[in-house]
Amino acid sequence: MIIKSVAVLGAGAVGSYVIWGLSEKKDIRLGVIASGERAKRLKNKGCKINDTVYHPEVWTPEEAHGVDFLIVSLKYGALPGALDNITAVTGENTVIMSLMNGVDSEEIIAEKVGAEHLLH
């Protein structure tokens, strides 16, 4: 599989690190999934990482639907509220990687979208 589009759900410390690492990859379309005030803030101010401001694309879950690779980097407690967004993003060939703490985030996500989408 060639990865051409990556969405990050959760632009905190871990998600920002992913954004930093992928921002220079010109052959990958990179976006952060957000809505409401968070989306507005990310669009206007970007993500500041080590004194550098990055401006990844900001997508709603529906705009991100069908990305090649979804990175879930939420705090564990936010996962139940994000499952509908994860479902909205996941297309037929989307691969999901959880970078969350806890030992069962992959299983929780798999119950919603199917284990075939999860990278273990």
Annotate each language-model stretch with its function:
Residues 52-54, 59-120:
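Rossmann-like NAD(P)(H) cofactor-binding subdomain of soluble oxidoreductases
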Residues 1-50, 55:
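NAD(P)+-binding Rossmann beta1-loop-alpha1 motif at the extreme N-terminus of oxidoreductases
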